[in-house]
């Protein structure tokens, strides 16, 4: 309690001048109405005019009122006519239930009787007849009025106390006790709503009996002359009903029917009936005072009261209760998984919603009362002092409520804080918020188990390792901020699972995942021959987090994030043939962002992969990557993601399989790790917590460099890549884009992919497949093989030396058209796609036209082969072209195909060719749909998932 009051005192201190200024203004208004209260004002008098005649059928029963007053110690005074006239000049004693005179507070018996006879007032508080039959009811009403006045009139010296710098802690304590008592009474009043007399008596008793309120006069001078009952008994009833309804809505144990009724009551009594009640009472007051109550006057009063009531304030409260309800429903699942944080959030929303509902209902009624009384006072000299009095009082009460509201919010937040600390104590010091991430992960695992169990089949791997990054959770962030435990919260947590033969395995003994040190070790493959490592969600960069909570303002705090970063992920593979898709591993860190969220300064996390044995596949991500393929046939793919064109120059490499890959990633959006701020509010307190998460951020262009060792094949990007091979045997796949591929020396396998590519085999026996697009193919020296398929487009082949072959792998030889065009041989398939072999006839024509010409080069392809192994030699082509005057007749091609000797020769040669092409069958293309290197299409972008095996002849 001491800490709580100290916090309240601290919060009040900074508002000292504001409160003092407001209370001074209030005091000036109250002074005009309360001059007669400087001495003897605490005396209460039941005033009965000597000549007053009352109706025993409808009224209170004067005898009961007098008897009750005498028993309660209220002075009963009968005055002569002259005394009545004198009283009328002092704040309209006769015109109001309560009036102020130099002798004290006067309770007017006639006006009390008249008020209780009003139909509309009676509807709000119960029938006048039921309330006033007999001594007990009269005593209840009078004692309630007496106790309320006794409490509020105790506070007459607040200005003086402030000027003397009285104890702030005492002031805060009194304000808190007052507010808590009001709310407690409202909550209890729902059970005693049968009679207004009981309500007002309870309220008065509660206020009077609260510890410290007997001396409230030392602190609350601004309440001098407070005339609660003169504001209208029915208004208090409406206020209690409306606030009670809000509390019922917040009660999780209330029945559905009761909540429905309470919701109706909140909407209609607070926003509707208060307007009617205030307006009705003010009109009654004017009638009693002999003032006009015509339609225009009534409309003015009603409209003024309506403007003072804001349904939007109650809509915000309803949102809190709705949020609490949704949180409770959401929490059920995670509670079963060992985490109750969402229920704690719901508890907070219910608690603060109840406080908001109570305070808002009180303030709404006060605003309506002040507005209505001011409207009624227009043009009335008699009522003007009352309007001033009411305005001052409502302002003081609203100020006290707002100050106390923050303290009550903090009380609810403290309970949440204590429950979290107690849980951690009872669970061996485990982090409560980390436990929340564990529960979120388990729920996600349950939801996706069917999909995960099918991954072995879908990815064609005996073992699947699934790594899941649980990222920042807003509910966990809210709870950390509300409980002031933001220093303990994490940005997220990474988890690993293993699946074999459709079964979920415990991965802790199979895989080492250490996010703090940057280690991913999947080398313990057991009996599994193939495995696929799948990063289901973007994996944050490695390192450890530390947080520090700092106060930046009166109610403002920020929990700063400090990261001890590790500069790389180290991945270790074993003997299995493994596939790693690293495109979901975050490597780019946005250190600085501009106001639009664009990354202006970055840091990079490297990936170092040691693959070991097996035929491995690695899909490279957005940052620097070092790969040691080890043993086996290893491929490095750049075909997923949009991470810039490749430039590879291996002409100076001294080891086979070693490459330096340079990339320039143009400006655009890419996956980055960035730091953001989560904000949680506890009333006026604002808690900001920094956290890191992954996001596609716009960035400027950047360069990155990869180092590859012991890699057998490289698959390019969708951009215009440049490949320059080594003196060893290289395997390049251009992928999409207009690629330039130079095999250099060695027996190379070169595949263009989509796009109009330029491919040069260089020296050596090369395998060249242009792929789709109009490609320029050059074999260079050596015995080269070219491949063309239907749909590949129009290719141009230049060949010089060696025993070369051209395979139409899906066309029958007899379905092709051979013709001479200028110096070139043009072969057309059934799709009218052409393969032009440049300068096929040039040397022969030179020999015909130039005397003694000696051929210096051979631009012909020695064998052209159909899909079934049938073939035609360059010599046969020359003979048949000449025989057909520049074109081979269809019948001649048929003869070639049907010739037994040629077929026999074709079968023998076909076996050799098949072996050669088969050796290239590991080629992959991001666009060839014939042989799919499986990827979980439900987890990946479909446009990136069709990574293909080689296209065999």
From Swiss-Prot:
UniProt note: domains: The transmembrane domains are believed to be involved in pore formation in target cells. The Gly-rich region is probably involved in calcium binding, which is required for target cell-binding and cytolytic activity.
Segments traversing the membrane: 230-250, 297-317, 359-379, 381-401
Hemolysin-type calcium-binding repeat boundaries on the chain: 715-732, 733-750, 751-768, 769-786, 789-806
Subcellular location: Secreted; Host cell membrane
One term under GO cellular component: host cell plasma membrane
Any one GO biological process: killing of cells of another organism
Record has Membrane as a keyword: yes
Membrane disposition: Multi-pass membrane protein
Coiled coil feature spans: none
Top-rank taxon, per record: Bacteria
Keywords of this entry: Calcium, Cytolysis, Hemolysis, Host cell membrane, Host membrane, Lipoprotein, Membrane, Repeat, Secreted, Toxin, Transmembrane, Transmembrane helix, Virulence
Pfam families, per database record: HemolysinCabind, RTX, RTX_C
Post-translational modification: Acylated by LktC. The toxin only becomes active when modified.
Protein name: Leukotoxin
């Amino acid at each position: 309690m001491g800490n709580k009051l100290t916090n309240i005192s601290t919060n009040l201190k900074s508002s000292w001048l504001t409160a003092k200024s407001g209370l001074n203004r209030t005091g000036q208004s109250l002074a005009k109405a309360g001059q007669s209260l400087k001495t003897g004002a605490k005396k209460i008098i039941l005033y009965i005019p000597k000549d007053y005649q009352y109706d025993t059928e409808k009224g209170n029963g004067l005898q009961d009122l007098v008897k009750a007053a005498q028993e309660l110690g209220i002075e009963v005074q009968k005055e002569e006519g002259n005394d009545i006239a004198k009283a009328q000049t002092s704040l309209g004693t006769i015109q109001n239930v309560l009036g102020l005179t130099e002798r004290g507070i006067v309770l007017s018996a006639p006006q009390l009787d008249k008020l209780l006879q009003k139909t509309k007032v009676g509807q709000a508080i119960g029938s006048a007849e039921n309330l006033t039959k007999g001594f007990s009811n009269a005593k209840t009403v009078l004692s309630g009025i007496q106790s309320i006045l006794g409490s509020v009139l105790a506070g007459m010296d607040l200005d003086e106390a402030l000027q003397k710098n009285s104890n702030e802690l005492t002031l805060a304590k009194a304000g808190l006790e007052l507010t808590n008592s009001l709310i407690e009474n409202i909550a209890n009043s729902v059970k005693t709503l049968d009679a207004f007399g009981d309500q007002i008596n309870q309220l008065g008793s509660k206020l009077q009996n609260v510890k410290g309120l007997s001396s409230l006069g030392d602190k609350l001078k601004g309440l001098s002359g407070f005339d609660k009952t003169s504001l209208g008994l029915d208004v208090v009833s409406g206020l209690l009903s409306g606030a009670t309804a809000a509390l019922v809505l917040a009660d999780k144990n209330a029945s559905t029917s009761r909540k429905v009724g309470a919701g109706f009551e909140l909407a209609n009594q607070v926003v509707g009936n208060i307007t009617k009640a205030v307006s009705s009472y003010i009109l009654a007051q004017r009638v009693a005072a002999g003032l006009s109550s015509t339609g225009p006057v009534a409309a003015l009063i009603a409209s003024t009261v309506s403007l003072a009531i804001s349904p939007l304030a109650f809509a915000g409260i309803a949102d809190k209760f709705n949020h609490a309800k949704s949180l409770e429903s959401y929490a059920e699942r995670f509670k079963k998984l060992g985490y109750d944080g969402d229920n704690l959030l719901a508890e907070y929303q219910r608690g603060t919603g109840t406080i908001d509902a109570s305070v808002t209902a009180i303030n709404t009624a006060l605003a309506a009362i002040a507005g209505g009384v001011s409207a009624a006072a227009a043009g009335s000299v008699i009522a003007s002092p009352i309007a001033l009095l009411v305005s001052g009082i409502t302002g003081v009460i609203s100020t006290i409520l707002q100050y106390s509201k923050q303290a009550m919010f903090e009380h609810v937040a403290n309970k949440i804080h204590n429950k979290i600390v107690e849980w951690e104590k009872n669970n061996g010091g485990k982090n409560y918020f980390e436990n929340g991430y564990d529960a979120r992960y388990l729920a996600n695992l349950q939801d996706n188990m069917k999909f995960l169990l099918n991954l072995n089949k879908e990815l064609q791997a005996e073992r699947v390792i699934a790594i899941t990054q649980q990222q920042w959770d807003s509910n966990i962030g809210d709870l950390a901020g509300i409980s002031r435990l933001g220093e303990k919260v994490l940005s997220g947590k990474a988890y690993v699972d293993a699946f074999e033969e459709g079964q979920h395995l415990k991965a802790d003994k199979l895989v080492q995942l250490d996010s703090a040190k940057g280690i991913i070790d999947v080398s313990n493959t057991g009996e599994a021959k193939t495995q696929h490592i799948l990063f289901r969600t973007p994996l944050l960069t490695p390192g450890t987090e530390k947080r520090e909570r700092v106060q930046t303002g009166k109610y403002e705090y920020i929990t700063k994030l400090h990261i001890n970063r590790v500069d790389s992920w180290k991945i270790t593979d074993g003997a299995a043939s493994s596939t790693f898709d690293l495109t979901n591993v975050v490597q780019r860190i946005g250190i600085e962002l501009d106001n639009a969220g664009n990354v202006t300064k970055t840091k990079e996390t490297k990936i170092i992969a040691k693959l070991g044995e097996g035929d491995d596949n690695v899909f490279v991500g957005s940052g620097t990557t070092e790969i040691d393929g080890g043993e086996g046939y290893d491929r490095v793919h750049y075909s997923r993601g949009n991470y810039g064109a490749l430039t590879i120059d291996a002409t100076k490499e001294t080891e086979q399989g070693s490459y330096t890959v340079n990339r320039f990633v143009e400006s655009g959006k890419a996956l980055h790790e960035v730091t953001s701020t989560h904000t949680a509010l506890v009333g006026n307190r604002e808690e900001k917590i920094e956290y890191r998460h992954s996001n596609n951020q716009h960035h400027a262009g950047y360069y990155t460099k990869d180092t590859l060792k012991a890699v057998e094949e490289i698959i390019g990007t969708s951009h215009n890549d440049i490949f320059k091979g080594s003196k060893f045997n290289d395997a390049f796949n251009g992928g999409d884009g207009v690629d330039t591929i130079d095999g250099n020396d060695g027996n190379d396998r070169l595949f263009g992919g989509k796009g109009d590519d330029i491919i040069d085999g260089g020296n050596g026996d090369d395998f060249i497949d242009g792929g789709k697009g109009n490609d320029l193919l050059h074999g260079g020296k050596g015995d080269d093989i070219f491949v063309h398929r239907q749909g590949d487009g129009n290719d141009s082949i230049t060949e010089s030396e060696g025993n070369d072959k051209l395979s139409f792998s899906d066309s029958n030889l007899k379905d092709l058209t051979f013709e001479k065009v200028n110096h070139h041989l043009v072969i057309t398939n059934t799709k009218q796609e052409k393969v032009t072999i440049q300068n096929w006839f040039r040397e022969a024509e030179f020999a015909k036209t130039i005397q003694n010409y000696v051929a210096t080069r051979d631009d012909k392809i020695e064998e052209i082969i159909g899909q079934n192994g049938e073939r035609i030699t360059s010599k046969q082509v020359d003979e048949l072209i000449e025989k057909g005057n520049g074109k081979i007749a269809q019948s001649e091609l048929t003869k070639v195909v049907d010739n037994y000797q040629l077929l026999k020769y074709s079968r023998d040669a076909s076996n050799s060719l098949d072996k050669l092409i088969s050796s290239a069958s590991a080629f992959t293309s991001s666009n060839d749909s014939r042989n799919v290197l499986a990827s979980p299409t439900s987890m990946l972008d479909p446009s990136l998932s069709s990574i293909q095996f080689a296209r065999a002849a």
